[in-house]
């Protein structure tokens, strides 16, 4: 972990990239930016560990971050993948001595913006609409967590893999002449952990989808969704 100076952020107002701050005018954004601490992490480095005291709002500025828990069997379970503009630690804003109930690891080189609980309280008092946006995001995450739990409990591997590709397509995809090109935020092992299958299973299912003409695999880090309708049929 490295502390970094980020004067460019202060002039470009990087906080405007964060959905919960998007409605603020330039003066209020400047106040937010003045309270931000900037940190950088290398790929694989822990940003926080389950059980650590949570006393700040952490915003992803660059890169991807995975949130994980350890199962009773001692295996890693990825519960969420965060991208620039996403955040965690919001529950600490409303609870005293809140502890992280997950660990966060950098999936790539990562830069974060951290706002202390005290700084966020000041921001929320001056801009109460941000509280509503945070609670809306928390509600969305609870629904996603329920969907993930149901997916892991009831759906077979074909549905899980298709759902994962669809999710990544929505979050990381962009349209090309060949279809929706997706830059995968994680490797095969992490993808397998995310949906509760083995690495061999996810490789086999991806090959099956490619052979069916639904997707094309471009190395290990990119895929192209060639037929979204047929992908939905697998779900």
Regions found by a protein language model. Give the residues of each.
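Cyclic nucleotide-binding regulatory module and flanking cytosolic helices
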Residues: 1-43, 92-95, 126
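Cyclic nucleotide-binding regulatory domains
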Residues: 20, 45-108
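Cyclic-nucleotide recognition modules
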Residues: 29, 80-143
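Short aromatic/basic micro-patch
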Residues: 57, 81, 106, 114, ...
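Structural motif
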Residues: 64, 109-111, 214, 221-222
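Polybasic "coupling" helices that flank or enter modular domains
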Residues: 125-196
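Phosphate-/nucleic-acid-contacting segments
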Residues: 170-235
